[in-house]
Amino acid sequence: MNYTELEQKIGKQTESDWHQASGGGWIHKDAKVKNELNIRDNAIVMGNAQVYGDARVYGDAWVYDDARVYDDARVYGNALVYGDACVYDNAQVYGNAQVYDDARVYGNAQVYGDALVYSHAWVYGKSERD
């Protein structure tokens, strides 16, 4: 995805506020990403979001607001993680799933399909939510 395509997804932006990650995705200047190689494909990390450890965001996934993705977590497909949500340990969020507000997904949990995890919900261990 080039910058023009990025603008089509998120609206008019100042180009200098963005840079393309080494892995191919896009990172906003306010977001904190430990390893740019882990932001791949058309993924977007913006706002005050943080991605660190060996966490990966790829496909068409978005991580934004104050959300955090870390450890060995994966967010991919068309998944959205936002608000104050956290995805960590070996958790995976994918498909069209959304994790937001103060929700937590961790351990070996998987959230996928059209699942919504929000408010103060916790999904953990070997749980699956579709």
Residue spans for each PLM region:
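Extended, small-residue-rich solenoid/repeat segments and analogous flexible loops
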Residues: M1-Y52
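Intrinsic disorder/low-complexity segments enriched in polar/small residues
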Residues: T14, D30, N35, V51, ...
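Long terminal segments
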Residues: Y118-D130
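Thr-biased low-complexity repeat/linker tracts and other Thr-enriched repetitive architectures
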Residues: D41-A121
